[in-house]
């Protein structure tokens, strides 16, 4: 039953009209209540084989069409695998403490070490003070 559900999700993710998507989703609800026979499952798989681009599991996400530089063949790239562009990138602010050290953000740090002794060894604790 899991394989049947996966195939239907792939078909829904392809290029279908909204009405067809609603019909397939309604069929999913009916099939959960009534178990379908093996013959019905086989027929559904055969229908999906006719749509080769939709039956492959790697195409489960919606695809975006991009063209080569010369405007020839369209490329189908899943949305999450697109290359970064100025439109889909937002500037990230790096917190001050993660920036590389420069002469402007360096301060002198004094360390005060406290040693605690126990019967099994010694533990050091470093206390930092920033001037």
Curated annotation (Swiss-Prot):
Compositionally biased residues, Acidic residues: 20-33
Region feature Disordered, mapped onto this chain: 16-71
Protein name: Putative uncharacterized protein DDB_G0276139
Originating organism: Dictyostelium discoideum (Social amoeba)
